């Protein structure tokens, strides 16, 4: 149980996919202008990454490894992710039409989010068990959502701030993202080697 808790905390805070591994920067910058959109995208991404990690582990251990088709891993994972995203899109469209309209083009773009593909690939490289892969996928997506919601909250406040003209827009957003990355580096002290 302690191993799973350490995996969760380490993935969410210490090895955050956005601020440490620099995966998923496109939705991080694109959807984080409004808090509501960031929360919706975070929930959708959490669902997709968690389910894709579980499905990718199953595909890897039940199909690719027994049939010696490991060289098809990336293509198989992309196919799994596309199916999971389409399923998520159908669920969001039926359950929350407002959120579906709010997310717009970003929902289908989850398919091309490098964090969604990176999590299962890294999980396989780390030789995770099924439970570890599920926790790793869930915690990576929680870390992604946490950073995106925090960043959206800061960006909403920056709109009201008196920012110098050269720093308005993307410039101050990138500076803020850098400061957040520095803050998350402080969590590295939680892990002892």
Curated annotation (Swiss-Prot):
Q: What sort of enzyme, by top EC class, is this?
A: translocase
Biological process (GO), any one? electron transport chain
One GO CC annotation: plasma membrane
> What membrane topology is given?
Multi-pass membrane protein
Enumerate the transmembrane spans.
Answer: 5-25, 47-67, 72-92, 102-122, 134-154, 171-191
Q: Does the keyword Cell membrane apply?
A: yes
One of its Pfam families is Rnf-Nqr
Q: What is its main location?
A: membrane
Entry EC no(s):
7.-.-.-
User: Where does it reside?
Assistant: Cell inner membrane
InterPro entries reported for this sequence:
Ion_transpt_RnfA/RsxA, NqrDE/RnfAE, NqrDE/RnfAE_oxidrdctase
The entry's keywords? Cell inner membrane, Cell membrane, Electron transport, Membrane, Translocase, Transmembrane, Transmembrane helix, Transport
Instruction: Identify its protein family.
Output: Belongs to the NqrDE/RnfAE family.
What does this gene product do?
Answer: Part of a membrane-bound complex that couples electron transfer with translocation of ions across the membrane.
Q: Which NCBIfam families match?
A: PRK05151.1 (NF003481), rnfA (TIGR01943)
Q: How does it assemble?
A: The complex is composed of six subunits: RnfA, RnfB, RnfC, RnfD, RnfE and RnfG.
The record, for PANTHER family, names: INTEGRAL MEMBRANE PROTEIN OF SOXR-REDUCING COMPLEX, ION-TRANSLOCATING OXIDOREDUCTASE COMPLEX SUBUNIT A
Specify the protein name.
Ion-translocating oxidoreductase complex subunit A
This chain's source organism reads Erwinia tasmaniensis (strain DSM 17950 / CFBP 7177 / CIP 109463 / NCPPB 4357 / Et1/99)
* Lineage, opening ranks: Bacteria, Pseudomonadati, Pseudomonadota, Gammaproteobacteria, Enterobacterales
